[in-house]
């Protein structure tokens, strides 16, 4: 069944359809959310910045003390093999996710988590890119909303570790969508500073300058970095700073960056139009430039 064979592979090179993919109920991914992750997208079915995603994944391994029991070169080889195996199940113009979820493996209640008692659970799968829900926002912009739920402080969990302990992201997104079903969350930290979206980074334009929060309380997104590089190549000044809701509300333009949709314009913030309520010229220029990387 094509719908059931978009692909999943594990470290032992077993490729199985989705319906046959299983992990133990005692896996640390299930019991503790003890999982690091990366999600890469393809363009023309070629993975975009896979090396950078894997480099970040291995930094997360180091900081979480998860031993993947394979080198980064082996991880890349298995990932590319998986894409090759399942590419015929995708249409010629269809792109996909390449997702890595790696847990510490079997968890023993009351055990010492510093002792990895089993092989890690390495889950790699492909999934169709469904951009339909985001497509309208390229022209009309999204409504950015600040939910009550706050970012987990970096003193508790460094935001640069990309992990699957994502309950607070889910709550924040639910709260934003209760305000507006089409809303995208802008999560603040405990001090009221702008942190990030549940799956992306926040940017604003003010007086021709591109401004984004520092990585003190947000993930250092790869699309974030690409956007900043493009802006500099276009002679747009880039500033990393502490920003607050006031700054977004009074900005000239605003957008969110993330792997699947690259750049999503925001034209409304907490019910108020941003500038004239239209997608701004610098945002449009950055979108076009990013497409042609």
Region locations from a protein language model:
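Short histidine-centered catalytic/ligand-binding loop motif
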Residues: 43, 58-71, 157-163, 211-218
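N-terminal nucleophile
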Residues: 22-37, 103, 124, 177-290
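A residue-level signal for conserved active-site and pocket-lining positions in enzyme catalytic cores
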Residues: 13, 33, 57, 100, ...
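Adenylate-forming
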Residues: 57, 292-293
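Single conserved hydrophobic/aromatic residue that forms the stacking wall/gate
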Residues: 1-12, 291-292
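Extended Lys/Arg-rich, glycine-bearing segments that form polyanion-binding/interaction patches
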Residues: 74-180, 275-278, 282-290
